[in-house]
Curated annotation (Swiss-Prot):
Organism: Meyerozyma guilliermondii (strain ATCC 6260 / CBS 566 / DSM 6381 / JCM 1539 / NBRC 10279 / NRRL Y-324)
InterPro entries cross-referenced by the UniProt entry: mRNA_G-N7_MeTrfase_dom (IPR004971), mRNA_G-N7_MeTrfase_euk (IPR016899), RG7MT1 (IPR039753), SAM-dependent_MTases_sf (IPR029063)
Name of the protein: mRNA cap guanine-N(7) methyltransferase
Residue ranges of domain mRNA cap 0 methyltransferase in the record: 271-579
Gene Ontology cellular-component annotations: nucleus
Site entry (mRNA cap binding), positions: K311, K317, R342, H410, E503, Y571
Length: 580
C-alpha cells in the first residue's frame, strides 16, 4: 500500500460489482489518499492495497451473560408477558373468547361462519338482538365479508373480555415505551447465520391434503434442533401423491421436510448454492435497511411483521435495522419451531441503563422481543392467527412499521381471493407511512424468456440452467402475458433448496394495481442485480464479513457470476408505502 504523508482519509469504494453495461466484467476497489489503516467500526479495520480489499477483524470482549436454565419452561416470547399456552386458552370459559374467533361446531370449512344464518323463527317469535362487531378487528374484514359476518350479543363478547383486557393489553402498551437507542450499523454474526432465502418446511404423514389451516402454537415445550453432520447432503423432498394435493399441503410438506433435513445436511458453506444464498441475503439486508422506517412518534418501538418468516432467516435483518418488536408467522409449523429456537439461542440479555445512558445493542445478538405463530396469511386474518395464543397483541403492537414477505408472496397468486386476503392483512397491519417490503419472481424476466423462446433444448415450456429451472404445466402464451392474471402455475426448482414446488406468476402491474386499491403506493422496484449494483458500495462495510466473503467471485471480486447470476436475476425487490 502506498503511504500518504498528507494525513489519513477514509477509504472509498468506487466499484465492487459488475454493472449491466460491463456484464460479467470484474469490479474493483479504488482508494484515494489513504493511510495504512482506516477504522471502519469499533471492531474492524480495513486495509486497501492495489485495489484489493483485505479485512482484519479484532474480536470484541465477550459480554458476561447469565446461562439459561434448560429446565425452565421458556415461552415463545422470551421475557415477554404476552405468552399464553393452548391449554390455558382452552381452560378459559367460552365467554372469554372474542366473538370474531368463534366457529360453528358443525362448520364444514373456515368460511361457513361468514354465511348468513337461515331464519328458522316461528311466526311472531322475537328476533335475537344483533349488535355491532368488535371495532378493534373489523378493519381486517373486507366489505363483502363484513356484510356476511355473524353477529353475536354484547354479553357474549364484552363481559369477561372487557374485564381482563386492561391487564393483558397494558403489558403491550408498556412495551411500546421501551425502545432502545444507539443501534450500531453493522450486521452482526449470530450463533446461527441465516440458512438461505426461502421459508423452509414437516413430515408428509402429518400434512394430508385439504386440511384446515394450522392453528397458532406456542413452542416453549418443543425439542431443539439436532447438530448437523460433517458431510453435506443436498436436499431432496419426498411428497407422495403430489398431483392430488392442494398448494397449501405441498408447500407446507416441502418446507417442513426442508427444515428437518437441513439439520442433518452439514455445513451450509458446502451447499452448491452457498454464494447464491449469500447474494440473496445481502439484497434483503439492502431492501430492509433502506425501507424500514422508524415510528415518528417519540417513544414508540419499531415493529416488524414477517408474514412468511420460515426458519427465522431474517431475524438477523430485524436486528440490523434496529427493530424493537418482531412478529413472525409461517404456514410451516416445523419452520416456526426452528425460528423460535434460533431466536431463543441468540436473544440478548439486555444491558441495564447506566447513569441515564441507554445500553449499546450487542450486534451479535437479538436485542428485540419476538413472538411466532403458525398460520396462513393468505387465507386467515392476522387476528385469527395471533390472538388465540397472544390475547391483546393486535391492539397492543399494531399497527406495525413494516410488513415483510420474502420469497413467498407468489404462492398467494393461486387465486384472486388469496391475493386480496394477503393485501388486506398487509394494509390493515401497517401504520400510515409504514412500508410493505418484499421479493418475488420477476414477471418481466419470465416474459423475456418466453418472448425470446429461451427454453431448454427440446422443450417449449421450460427454462433455466444447472442451478434453477421453471417448468410451466402447459405452453405459456407467446407474448408472455398471462390472462387471467391468477392461477398461472409453474414448478420451480432451485438446487438444494426448492424441489419442483408449484408457484404462480405474479404479473407486477396487476399486483401494483391491487395494492393501490388498499392504500399502498409503489415507492421502489428493481431486479436483484440492479439492487446489488446500486447498494453494495453503501452496505459493503455494514454487512457481516462472512456474508460478504461468501459473495466473492472466482476472480476475487464480489457479486453473482455465471449460472448464479441468471438464477438471482429471476427475482425483484419492491417497497410500497401505506398512505395516510
Amino acid at each position: 500500500m502506498s503511504g500518504s504523508k498528507q494525513g489519513s482519509e477514509k477509504a472509498s469504494i468506487t466499484s465492487l460489482i459488475d454493472s449491466e453495461e460491463q456484464g460479467d466484467e470484474a469490479t474493483s476497489v479504488s482508494t484515494q489518499n489513504q493511510s495504512p489503516k482506516t477504522q471502519i467500526t469499533q471492531t474492524e479495520n480495513v486495509e486497501v492495497q492495489n485495489s484489493d480489499l483485505k479485512v482484519t477483524e479484532n474480536k470484541p470482549k465477550n459480554t458476561e451473560m447469565k446461562p439459561t436454565d434448560p429446565n425452565t419452561n421458556a415461552s415463545t416470547t422470551e421475557n415477554t408477558p404476552i405468552t399464553t399456552s393452548n391449554a390455558q386458552v382452552s381452560e378459559k370459559s367460552e365467554k372469554t373468547v372474542p366473538a370474531w374467533m368463534r366457529e360453528p361446531e358443525e362448520a364444514q370449512n373456515r368460511y361457513d361462519r361468514y354465511v348468513p344464518r337461515v331464519d328458522n323463527r316461528r311466526r311472531g317469535e322475537p328476533r335475537v338482538a344483533e349488535v355491532r362487531q368488535d371495532p378493534r378487528y373489523a378493519k381486517y374484514l373486507r366489505q363483502d365479508q363484513e356484510e356476511r359476518r355473524i353477529r353475536r350479543p354484547d354479553d357474549e363478547y364484552e363481559g369477561d373480555h372487557k374485564r381482563r383486557r386492561p391487564e393483558m393489553v397494558t403489558q403491550f402498551d408498556d412495551r411500546r415505551q421501551g425502545t432502545r437507542k444507539n443501534h450500531p450499523g453493522q450486521a452482526g454474526q449470530s450463533e446461527s447465520e441465516e440458512n438461505g432465502d426461502e421459508q423452509q418446511g414437516d413430515d408428509e404423514e402429518e400434512t394430508p391434503g385439504n386440511e384446515e389451516p394450522v392453528e397458532a402454537q406456542p413452542y416453549s415445550r418443543l425439542a431443539t434442533s439436532v447438530q448437523s453432520t460433517q458431510h453435506y447432503h443436498t436436499f431432496q423432498s419426498h411428497i407422495a401423491n403430489k398431483e392430488n394435493k392442494d398448494i397449501n399441503s405441498i408447500v407446507r410438506s416441502h418446507y417442513n421436510q426442508r427444515t428437518i433435513q437441513s439439520k442433518m445436511q452439514g455445513s451450509r458453506t458446502k451447499s452448491p448454492i452457498y454464494k447464491l444464498r449469500n447474494f440473496n441475503n445481502a439484497v434483503k439486508y439492502m431492501l430492509l435497511g433502506n425501507h424500514v422506517r422508524k415510528n415518528p412518534n417519540p417513544g414508540s418501538p419499531t415493529v416488524i411483521l414477517d408474514m412468511c418468516c420460515g426458519k427465522g432467516g431474517d431475524l438477523n435483518k430485524a436486528e440490523f435495522v434496529g427493530a424493537d418488536q418482531y412478529v413472525g408467522i409461517d404456514i410451516s409449523d416445523a419452520s416456526v419451531k426452528e425460528a423460535f429456537h434460533r431466536y431463543r439461542r441468540n436473544k440478548a440479555r439486555f444491558i441495564p441503563r447506566d447513569g441515564g445512558r441507554a445500553g449499546q445493542r450487542d450486534s451479535r445478538k437479538y436485542n428485540f422481543e419476538a413472538c411466532f405463530a403458525t398460520g396462513d396469511c393468505f387465507q386467515q386474518s392476522i387476528p385469527e392467527i395471533l390472538e388465540p395464543n397472544f390475547p391483546g397483541i393486535v391492539n397492543g403492537l399494531f399497527p406495525v412499521d413494516c410488513v415483510s414477505i420474502q420469497f413467498s408472496m407468489h404462492y398467494s397468486f393461486e387465486s384472486e381471493e388469496r391475493v386480496r386476503t394477503m393485501l388486506n392483512n398487509v394494509s390493515k397491519s401497517l401504520r400510515p407511512g409504514g412500508t410493505f417490503v418484499g421479493t418475488i419472481p420477476s414477471s418481466d424476466f419470465i416474459r423475456d424468456k418466453i418472448v425470446n423462446k429461451d427454453f431448454l433444448p427440446g422443450t417449449n415450456n421450460k427454462f433455466g440452467n444447472e442451478l434453477y429451472s421453471v417448468t410451466f404445466d402447459r405452453t405459456p402464451p407467446s407474448d408472455g402475458i398471462f390472462r387471467p392474471p391468477f392461477g398461472n402455475k409453474y414448478d420451480y426448482f432451485l438446487k438444494d433448496a426448492v424441489d419442483n414446488v408449484p408457484e404462480y406468476v405474479v404479473p407486477f402491474e396487476v399486483f401494483r394495481s391491487m395494492c393501490e386499491e388498499v392504500g399502498l403506493t409503489l415507492r421502489y422496484k428493481k431486479n436483484f442485480i440492479e439492487i446489488f449494483n446500486q447498494e453494495i458500495p453503501k452496505y459493503f462495510h455494514k454487512l457481516n464479513r462472512n456474508l460478504v466473503d461468501g459473495m466473492k467471485r472466482a476472480d476475487g471480486k464480489y457479486g453473482a457470476e455465471g449460472a448464479e447470476k441468471e438464477a438471482v436475476s429471476f427475482y425483484l425487490g419492491f417497497a410500497f408505502e401505506k398512505l395516510g
